[in-house]
Amino acid sequence: RDYYASRGLGDVYKRQIIHGDRDRLLGFSQPEHPVALQLGGSDPADLAESVRIASAYGYDEYNLNCGCPSERVQKGSFGACLMLEPQTVAACVRAMQDVTDKPVTVKHRIGVDDHNEYGFVRDFVGTVYDAGCRVFIVHTRSAWLKGLSPKENREVPPLVRETAFRLKKDFPDTVMLINGQIASLDEAKALVDAGMDGVMVGRAAYQNPWMLAGVDEVLYGVEHDVTRLECVHRMTAYLEENYRDDVHAIRAVARHVNGLAQGLPGARRWRQVLSDPAAIKDRGAGLIQYAWEEAFGEG
């Protein structure tokens, strides 16, 4: 069973990987494995150099972003607009594969602007497949590069999940993962049972990370005994070990555990304490533990 956490770095960070603070950009804790590094770019040599540098940090997968529709990303010539240049994507994939024995994967949309017929995405996948890629993460919406914000691009273009199933049928020896508005583990299981090799869950897991505690039980019938409080203890230990005196980092980590208490009485107080500047400064690495005690009276 592989549950991948993904760390995404865009074109600016690609350049910073080569020239900047690599430990800050690429470092992570060993318990986070397996971790995939998502890169954005369209220059095969730069991407290969980024992968070569990142390999020292022990990433388990390298993913090329061919799905982001933002204007900033388009100006950098990467993201969803790369689907219009499949040969460039193929060259990037080959260059990345040449410097690593880890999987090089591609995340993409099912179309771009008016190119929304099945043949377009089938040919894109076929070209990248011929370059050696065998793992595709399919966001089952088209990307509209003009007139929509990234948020609107996650909501307005219609969801066409059948496209991912057609791709799996046409490329049966690939690992095909489906992405896009998967809101629950039951929904994820239904997609796997229907023939997908896996799913990528994004926003639903971010907004309610506790849903991930049920993955083993729902997908594999294996019960778990993890509690939210245990997660709080682990996150506190993580902050103590890595960011004891780094208020900026503590604030960032706290922001990303907001959803742990979603649906619980006291969740509002939990969020208030986590975002309180005075609490962040005074409690430091003990902030998350303190917030839980304030909201739920246990610790």
Regions inferred by a protein language model and the residue ranges of each:
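Alpha/beta catalytic cores of nucleotide-metabolism and tRNA/nucleoside-modifying enzymes
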Residues: A91-R94, V99-D101, V112-V135, L159-I178, ...
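Glycine- and other small-residue-rich loops at beta-strand/loop junctions that grip anionic moieties
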Residues: L39, C81, E85, K107, ...
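Alpha/beta enzyme core
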Residues: A48-Y62, C66-F78, Q87-T174
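Short, structured active-site "lid" loops
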Residues: D23-Q38
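Alpha/beta catalytic barrel-like cores
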Residues: D11-I17, S50
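Short gly/pro/ser/thr-enriched loop/turn and capping motifs at secondary-structure boundaries
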Residues: K14-R15, S70, W144, A205-P209
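Single conserved hydrophobic/aromatic residue that forms the stacking wall/gate
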Residues: R1-Y13
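Hydrophobic faces of well-ordered beta-strands that scaffold small-molecule active sites
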Residues: R7, V35-L39, Y62, V104-H108, ...
